[in-house]
Amino acid sequence: MAASFLPSILVPLVGLVFPAIAIASLFIYIEQDEII
């Protein structure tokens, strides 16, 4: 039963968390590049 509703949670989680991590890491890279 857990496997039936797992994709409905996992897909939005990956769709929101992965871009957030990518944007945050890019922002940190740009900030460090400006400081140096």
Curated annotation (Swiss-Prot):
The lineage of its organism: Eukaryota, Viridiplantae, Streptophyta, Coleochaetophyceae, Coleochaetales. It is a single-pass membrane protein. It is found in: Plastid, Chloroplast thylakoid membrane. Pfam families: PSI_8. Keywords: Chloroplast, Membrane, Photosynthesis, Photosystem I, Plastid, Thylakoid, Transmembrane, Transmembrane helix. PANTHER family: PHOTOSYSTEM I REACTION CENTER SUBUNIT VIII, PTHR35775. HAMAP family: PSI_PsaI (MF_00431). May help in the organization of the PsaL subunit. InterPro entries: PSI_PsaI (IPR001302), PSI_PsaI_sf (IPR036357). Belongs to the PsaI family. Its main location: plastid. It comes from Chaetosphaeridium globosum. The chain crosses the membrane at residues 5-27. It comes from the Eukaryota. This is Photosystem I reaction center subunit VIII. GO terms for cellular component: chloroplast thylakoid membrane; photosystem I. One of its GO terms (biological process) is photosynthesis.
